[in-house]
Amino acid sequence: MASLGAGQALAGVVEGLLAHLLVTAQDADDECSTAAKAAVPSLFTNESGTDVALVAASEQRRTMGAEEAGTSGLMALGARGSTTFDLTASSDLFRLGAPELNARLVILTTAGIVAASTAVAFDRSRRRRRIPTWAAVLIGIGFVLAFLAWAGAGSRGVIPLVTILSSALGLSVPLVYGSLAGIIGERSGTINIAIEGQLLGGAFLGAVVASACSNPWVGILAAPVAGVLVALLLALFGLRYRVNQIVVGVVLNVLVSGLTGFLFSTFLSSSPSLNRALRLPTLAVPLLSRIPIIGPVLFRQTILVYLMYAAVAVLSVMLFRSRWGLRLRACGEHPKAADTVGINVMRTRVANLALAGALAGLGGAFFTVGSGLSFENDMTAGNGYIALAAMILGAWRPLGSLGAALLFGFATSVAQTLPVIGSSVSPDIISMIPYIVTILAVAGFVGKVRAPAAEGVPYP
């Protein structure tokens, strides 16, 4: 029963949160995609001439939140005992304490909130109006609280909510940087499978340079260089010599893994002074960092997190509200049309691929100087591929990819926390949480979003 409930719970979490990401992306379709639809209508319509993106978005609108409400009810049937939530950090302006709540009551209450929000979303969908953001937020938050109450029911410890959320944000940092790198590359028409190698290269170079200079700040300046080098190799073989970009990306990942492994075993193992565990200082924003719950999570972080906020905000605006963004998207949607109006497609793709590599390399620094760890072989552990999944689930948009990355980070954080508090959920189920979430998300949503029309297509 516990295993079945866990699977249903995870499916509900994934589909509820990602449905909103997909719907938002489809509702905000940009002018470049409109031009591409006019130029190549067969790519975007089915046999009857119906826009497939609109069909997918409509389906998600109508089902959004329904499974979450039903799954919350099932969890309430299996919940026994109480759950204690720790809501306070030591530096908060005021302490909220650690209330002990009846697990079944919490689940039923949140199920009611989810059901009400679902009704609003369904009504707005029926009238072909945009679903309000607050409804999607309530569905996501309500279901997360229900899942935590169910998982912690009858456990020996407390649910450290602030710790879980802080850990989720930290774990999502390299995923966000990686997904932004993927967005820039693929929006300009280049498939960037080499994100894993760029993250690993950034982690390696950041650790070595920081150790050599005894300064972690220098490390985050060096890390993007590794990402740019990998990106330029991808541009050389994938764009200049027209080798299949997916194959080149995979080969580069293997190359970086082998090269960093060789350097680690040959030089770093015998010279510990070049591989020290240096950490960037935590920077607290005055007053904001002392707000209960959200303050420690959002405003007591390292510079890498604050740069991540800025990168998402700037890219969200520049990608759709600037001349640079229009040129970039034109190269990814219809490079021939872009060339016709005087845009150098090759130069645009190479330059933006280098920018993407710099972002991914900076994200790789999180594994070493951002976390206070020394470099280890393959320490990125496939995060580059998960970042690609976040990019797809976010419909190639910065805010959508941020939400998907946070979801994956939250799943990993929960998997790390539940065994510590003595949760009654099977340890086998707990260890599977991050992978189940990734598989469910990709399987459920990857066919319902559209990639840039000319991604992976060499030009000229």
Language-model features: locations:
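Inter-helical junctions in multi-pass inner-membrane proteins, predominant
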Residues: 25-26, 32, 156-160, 165, ...
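Pore- or pathway-lining transmembrane helices of multi-pass membrane proteins that form conduits
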Residues: 174, 240-265, 274-276, 308, ...
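Short, non-helical or kinked segments that cap or interrupt transmembrane helices
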Residues: 184-205, 217-220, 239-252, 351, ...
